């Protein structure tokens, strides 16, 4: 007889908020990627272009952990037009010792949202100036909102600007976040105005053409690029990648999917060039920011190790809280 715990999105929201422990667990995962024999195969992705849809499958095994996660993550970006969320999905946590299913996490993409925001916080903590207090976010969806919440966990944010192609959504997000976070959040109609004087810039859009131009960047700024997780997506001007200190979540992945991919295609960067990975910066194996006036860019395409990390945290918290439903077969 095997036992499996099943957790719904509502239950997971109750036990896995976006907090400092979630940020720490994702940071530990990146460190493990740089220091342990992690097994992390390439992302499996299915594109469904006629419906602006894609499905990603990610996984990773970390030596020493009792379990590993396999995540199925659909993104259908026209769904809001018919009243549905653009992302959903689930994670399956399996035993590293037996391969048996330990938990089915029916999170509808919630855990992905949390671990992605946590990764943004890790990148900002490791690459932005410690006194960074002004943030600019491109996008007005759930991830844009969570990225700003995550930044507030690691930096003394006192002001934020939000820009999105849909000005009404940017305004709504600014109002909601200003009330929740307790500092000034303003919607901007011009993307350049949004980043002028900002210390940290986070891009969270599914754009296929750059929304952040190289000539807009100022000395000392840090950029976290979240949206380019497929070959056709491109938020950052490739010239900005060539100009800045560049850090990848997974260099093997960003050469194929991320903003680096577009800089290589534009012949601004060599496909063979070596760049630091975030885990190497965390572990002290490679430098991150070395000067206050340096422009840094973190290219985060999303990794399976983040999913295993957040699923493991969710399972531990569920057991501690006796949450979820146990299914026996």
Curated annotation (Swiss-Prot):
Signal peptide: none
A molecular function (GO) term: oxidoreductase activity
GO cellular component: cytoplasm
Enzyme category, top tier: oxidoreductase
InterPro entries on file: Ectoine_EutC, NAD(P)-bd_dom_sf, ODC_Mu_crystall, ODC_N
EC number, UniProt record: 1.-.-.-
Keyword annotations: NAD, Oxidoreductase, Plasmid
Pfam family, one: OCD_Mu_crystall
Tagged with keyword Methyltransferase: no
Presence of keyword Oxidoreductase: yes
Family annotation (PANTHER family): KETIMINE REDUCTASE MU-CRYSTALLIN
Family: Belongs to the ornithine cyclodeaminase/mu-crystallin family.
Protein's name in the database: Putative dehydrogenase RB0419
Organism for this UniProt entry: Rhizobium meliloti (strain 1021)
Lineage: Bacteria, Pseudomonadati, Pseudomonadota, Alphaproteobacteria, Hyphomicrobiales
């Amino acid at each position: 007889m095997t036992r499996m715990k099943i957790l719904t999105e509502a239950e997971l929201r109750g036990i896995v908020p976006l907090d400092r422990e979630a940020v720490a667990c994702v940071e530990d995962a990146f460190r493990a990627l740089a220091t342990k024999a992690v097994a992390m195969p390439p992302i499996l992705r299915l594109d469904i272009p006629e419906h602006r849809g894609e499905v990603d499958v990610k996984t990773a095994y970390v030596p020493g952990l009792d379990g590993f996660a396999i995540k199925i993550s659909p993104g259908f970006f026209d769904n809001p037009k018919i009243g549905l969320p653009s992302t959903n999905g689930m994670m399956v946590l399996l035993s590293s010792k037996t391969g048996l299913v330990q938990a089915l996490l029916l999170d509808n993409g919630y855990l992905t949202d949390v671990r992605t925001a946590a990764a943004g916080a890790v990148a900002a903590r490791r690459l932005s100036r410690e006194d960074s207090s002004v943030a600019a976010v491109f996008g007005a969806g759930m991830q844009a909102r969570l990225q700003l919440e995550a930044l507030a966990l690691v930096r003394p944010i006192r002001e934020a600007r939000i820009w999105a192609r849909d000005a009404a959504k940017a305004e709504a997000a600014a109002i909601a976040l200003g009330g929740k976070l307790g500092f000034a959040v303003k919607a901007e109609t011009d993307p350049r105005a949004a980043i002028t004087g900002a210390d940290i810039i986070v891009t969270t859009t599914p754009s296929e053409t750059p929304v952040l131009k190289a000539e807009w960047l100022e000395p000392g700024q840090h950029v976290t690029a979240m949206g380019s997780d497929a070959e056709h997506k491109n938020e950052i001007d490739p010239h900005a990648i060539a100009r800045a200190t560049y850090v990848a979540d997974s260099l093997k992945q960003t050469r194929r999917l991320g903003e680096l991919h577009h800089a290589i295609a534009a012949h601004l960067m060599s496909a063979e060039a070596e760049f630091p990975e975030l885990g190497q910066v965390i572990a002290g194996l490679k430098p991150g920011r070395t000067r206050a006036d340096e422009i840094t860019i973190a290219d985060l395409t999303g990794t399976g190790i983040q999913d295993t990390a957040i699923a493991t945290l969710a399972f531990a918290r569920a057991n501690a809280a006796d949450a979820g439903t146990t299914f026996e077969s």
